[in-house]
From Swiss-Prot:
The protein's name: Capsid protein VP1
Site (Interaction with host receptor F11R/JAM-1): N459, N462
Organism: Feline calicivirus (strain Japanese F4)
Keyword annotations: Capsid protein, Disulfide bond, Host cytoplasm, T=3 icosahedral capsid protein, Virion
Subunit structure: Homodimer. Homomultimer. Interacts with the minor capsid protein VP2. May bind to VP3 and Vpg proteins. Binds to alpha-2,6-linked sialic acid at surface of target cells. Interacts with host F11R/JAM-1/JAM-A; this interaction allows viral binding and entry into the host cell.
Pfam families documented for this protein: Calici_coat (PF00915)
Lineage: Viruses, Riboviria, Orthornavirae, Pisuviricota, Pisoniviricetes
Keyword Disulfide bond recorded: yes
GO CC terms in record: host cell cytoplasm; T=3 icosahedral viral capsid
Family, per entry: Belongs to the caliciviridae capsid protein family.
Length: 668
């Protein structure tokens, strides 16, 4: 031991006859370099400890170690560090490691005596008939093997993530329907390589900025031996958009049979030109499952189709790693996973057009709505926030007028009140009088029986098609009680209002007795939307020509055999004790989440949720990047509420959404 080391140890009241030796390079094991902290990564040395030259005086080293302690900075009391300096032979230096670094290294050395396979061992089943992680037919030869060199380079650049037991077993990702109606070339499954493929990777991805490596995918077919047919698993390189054509078979692919008993395992390789991918990178290798030969069931008939279910499970490949730890609270700019757009219980579902509970789904050729409808860019073509609260306006009228134009006082679009309803009247009206509801023969309807048994209900009310609002109407000098208000979007022409499916500040028609006399009176009006006067009309929001927009009306049609849906609820009618259906383009929670958060969803994909009713019937709802919802069946039928919803992942929009609900078939 050199004299300097011995003297330094005396200052620490340490026996200098003990030769304390350390090599901090062991804290940073790098395979290609024996001395990384002095050669390749000298900038990392301060993270592991403090270095002094042997020619420094013992007193100087002792004082600097005290002054560098956090306790000294706060109390100015000299505290001897818990770890004394040690001799770094190969460098000719004195090195004092940080206590936590030294303890971590010592525990790691002790842990080398443990069984290294113990933390990775997990038994999925003790029944030999049940598939365990090691079972399944691994398919190789046509797929690129993981690059060990790229993995090592990515580790050196950013640090390696911690190994865990979830790396050793397959986890459920999604399930895909394969029916006898699917023809050759039909894409059943397409997924780009990334953390979204695995639930554990998806969870851990929130802690990191980047990733790299392959993912293993296991497919299991739940059909029976009576089926015949083949699927092709195709590895599509980055930058190529899969098309539904057998031309895709020109890419590397393997085939597996519908009668395959053993699960089939594929590896999606990470083909990249950089050390790692950021979380927003979706231009990665894709795995596509395509129909190679049609599925055949000899016991099926012409009136319906049958099929089987392909279950998709995943686990990270041996080279998969996360990189660049993200501090808590940091927000990435690329967007988050759309896993919270639909509440788990239907008891929390209300419409974005009206605030009552969702009671059904309505499949239509086209779905359209502007107000309170949001897309994945956090944008809306409407004028309302995704919440329901009273509408606030002012009205100025004179000469006893009961018809006026409101002036917005709370808005996000200047001149249009937040929450103003988004349908117009059917034809020209002169609002006046009371309700007028008769049968087709002109008989007045006064009872529920007369209303329910009438073949035709004629609504000749002079304010039909307007919304009924509870009102808090205030004006200086007016001490009378507030009256019910009727509102709509329309063009005022004297005492007449005309339909208008575009809205601006001049079309906020309000029919209300605000106790106006001859002089101008300005009232402050707070309106709560409660009902509708369109007795005998079609559902609110079902007629495109009556749906109001500022300029553009967002609209969706069928995509890849999937049909757009409205979420149905109801609003109370005026006079008759009945309700009318309301069609909503989104659940209000979906609108709110899309307005507040930026989600990551490609334009050609769905965020898929599985809806299950109380009897076990289920179907998938896919939400596209425009915010519209789709289902893969033409008729949902009657569901037993309450329903539950669970996020299933991202699916290509051109693939039919799965369900166990059989569509109604008619044979001519």
């Amino acid at each position: 031991m050199c004299s300097t080391c011995a003297n330094v140890l005396k200052y620490y009241d340490w026996d200098p006859h003990f030769r304390l030796i350390i090599n901090p390079n062991k804290f940073l094991p790098i395979g290609f370099c024996d001395n990384p902290l002095m050669c390749c990564y000298p900038d990392l040395l301060p993270e592991f400890g403090t270095v002094w030259d042997c020619d420094q005086s013992p007193l100087q080293i002792y004082l600097e170690s005290i002054l560098g302690d956090d306790e000294w900075a706060s109390t100015h009391e000299a505290i001897d560090p818990s770890v004394p300096p040690m001799h770094w032979d190969s460098a000719g230096k004195i090195f004092q490691p940080h206590p936590g670094v030294l303890m971590h290294h010592l525990i790691g050395e002790v842990a080398k005596a443990w069984d290294p396979n113990l933390p990775l061992f997990r038994l999925e089943a003790d029944d030999g008939s049940i598939t365990t992680p090691e079972q399944g037919t691994a398919v190789g030869g046509v797929i690129a093997e993981p690059s060990a060199q790229m993995s090592t380079a990515a580790d050196m650049a950013s640090g390696k993530s911690v190994d865990s037991e979830w790396e050793a077993f397959f986890s459920f990702h999604t399930s895909v329907n394969w029916s006898t109606s699917e023809t050759q070339g039909k894409i059943l499954f397409k997924q780009s390589l990334g953390p979204l493929l695995n639930p554990y990777l998806e969870h851990l991805s929130k802690l990191y900025v980047a990733w790299s490596g392959s993912i293993e995918v296991r497919f299991s077919i739940s059909g029976s031996g009576v089926f015949g047919g083949k699927l092709a698993a195709i590895v599509v390189p980055p930058g190529v958009d899969p098309v539904q054509s057998t031309s895709m078979l020109q890419y590397p692919h393997v085939l597996f049979d519908a009668r395959q008993v053993e699960p089939v395992i594929f590896t999606i390789p990470d083909l990249r030109s950089t050390l790692y991918h950021v979380m927003s990178d979706t231009d990665t290798t894709s795995l596509v499952i395509m129909v190679y030969n049609d599925l055949i069931n000899p016991y099926a008939n012409d009136s319906n189709s049958s099929g089987c279910i392909v279950t998709v499970e995943t686990k990270p490949g041996p080279d998969f790693k996360f990189h660049l730890l993200k501090p808590p609270g940091s927000v990435l700019t690329h967007g988050s996973i759309p896993s919270d757009l639909i509440p788990k219980s239907s008891s929390l579902w209300i419409g974005n057009r009206y605030w009552t509970d969702i009671t059904d789904f309505v499949i239509r050729p086209f779905v359209f709505q502007a107000n309170r409808h949001f897309d994945f860019n956090q944008e809306t073509a409407g004028w309302s926030t995704p919440r329901f609260r009273p509408i606030t306006i002012t009205i100025s009228e004179k000469n006893g007028s009961k018809l006026g134009i409101g002036v917005a006082t709370d808005y996000i679009i200047p001149g249009i009140p937040d929450g103003w309803p988004d349908t117009t009247i059917a034809d020209k009206l002169i609002p006046a009088g009371d309700y007028s509801i008769t049968t087709g023969e002109g008989n007045d309807i006064k009872t529920a029986q007369a209303y329910d048994t009438a073949a035709v209900v004629k609504n000749t009310t002079n304010f039909r098609g307007m919304y009924i609002c509870g009102s808090l109407q205030r004006a200086w000098g007016d001490k009378k009680i507030s009256n019910t208000a009727f509102i709509t979007t329309a063009i005022r022409d004297g005492n007449e209002i005309k339909p208008s499916n575009t809205i601006d500040m001049t079309k906020l028609a309000v029919y209300q007795d605000t106790h106006v006399e001859q002089e101008v009176q300005t009232s402050d009006d707070t309106l709560a939307l409660l009902g509708y006067t369109g007795i005998g009309e079609e559902a609110i929001g079902s007629n495109r020509d009556r749906v109001v927009r500022i300029s553009v009306l967002p609209e969706a049609g069928a995509r890849g055999g999937n049909h757009p849906i409205f979420y149905k609820n109801s609003i109370k009618l005026g006079y008759v004790i009945r309700s009318i259906d309301v069609f909503n383009s989104q659940i209000l929670h979906t609108s709110r989440q899309l307005s507040l958060n930026h989600y990551l969803l490609p334009p050609d994909s769905f965020a898929v949720y599985r809806i299950i009713d109380s009897n076990g019937s289920w179907f998938d709802i896919g939400i596209d990047s425009e915010g519209f919802s789709f289902v893969g069946v033409s008729d949902i039928g009657k569901l037993e509420f309450p329903l539950s919803a669970s996020y299933m992942g991202i699916q290509l929009a051109k693939i039919r959404l799965a369900s166990n609900i059989r569509s109604r078939m008619t044979k001519l």
